[in-house]
Amino acid sequence: MVNRRSVLAGMGATAIAQLLSACSGTGKEKLTVRLLKDSIPVQLLSAFRRDQSQQVKLNFKAETQLKSLLKLLEDIHKQNQSPSQETSWLRLPGGNRSSSIDLVTLGDYWLKLAIQKELIQPLPIEQLSGWQSLPPQWQTLVRRDNQGKLAENGQIWGAPYRWGATVIAYDAKQFKDQGWEPPRDWSDLWKREEFRQQFSLLDQPREVIGLTLKKLGKSYNTQDLNQVPNLKAELIELNKRVKFYSSDAYLQPLILKDTSLAVGWSTEIFDIQKSYPHIKAVMPASGSALWTDLWVQPASGNEETESNSLVNDWIDFCWRKQSAEAISQLTGSPSPMANFSRQDLPTAIQDNPLIAISSEVLEKSDFLEPLPETTIEQYQDLWEEVRRNLE
């Protein structure tokens, strides 16, 4: 999901900067973090400071796009490979080298790449109480071998702190006016005639082929598409029914009533619900594609960074119940540790399926795992063949 969550967020980075400039402290211990804007509530930063037994200095800076954070990891790696060619723009305020960054937000989509390119190093967090409570689905995702492939006994390469999914958004007001029932599952895009030419799909083969696989009772991570009966026929039919494909311009048509439904990413839909509360969303009953934001540690080779106890303290702090609830309620993306009931949520979001997602649906959903090159070629060939049927 390369393009997901690339829309600029609100004022999160400014709020973090203001908070830290006011209370960064002068303690000897320092934690330097580069994170995705609005993925951590600013309230947690001051709470973490209060939680420490001694004064600490927090250096948090937010970026608006995950791709920018991946590039930061690449820049750190280049700097470490050629320290004599270090340039001033790779320095942090105060003259510290960028290799002193302790943690960076990384989307799980890029975890394999980051491991293969040696941009990050394993995290020694297996003994943390939070790790012991982290659901197996997330533990499995971040255990990888040195090539970035899933490995049951692999090292831990990331610490998940929030997640989201591909969902179906719809205009509840328009549905009520038309007397339509809300969508419930992917199959509605095929079988409900009133939806024909009324919905948009993400312009990504992994997403569209994946939801079709789910409709057929398969996994998003199916490796041999040729062995899935009726897959091509189902995709061709879906292609006839969709109004348009877009990964970055699907919300405006929904707001303007040019479409009645849109397949999109939960964080983006949560954001527009603040201004357009009639836009609702449903997590498809047969399961969906999942993503997660991770804390990763740059592969700096810096002994001071590796031994920084604040790294583990911060990760474990993010996994605490109160922190998990704050992340879930204030960022629009549930924490993997948020095992609270609906009654624990504010009334306004108790019934918001973007946050209060049922465990049954979650168990049916899939993180997008790395695929072999042969499978990637199958996806691309099938995608191109199906899209040619649009004319």
Range-by-range predicted roles:
Residues L36, E86, T105-W110, Q204, ...:
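Beta->alpha turn/N-cap motifs
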Residues V42, L70, I115-K240, S246, ...:
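Extracytoplasmic ligand-binding site segments that recognize negatively charged/polar headgroups
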Residues Q227-E237, Y276-A299:
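Periplasmic-binding protein-like
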Residues E325-E391:
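C-terminal capping/gating helix-and-loop segments adjacent to ligand/active sites or protein-protein/ligand interfaces
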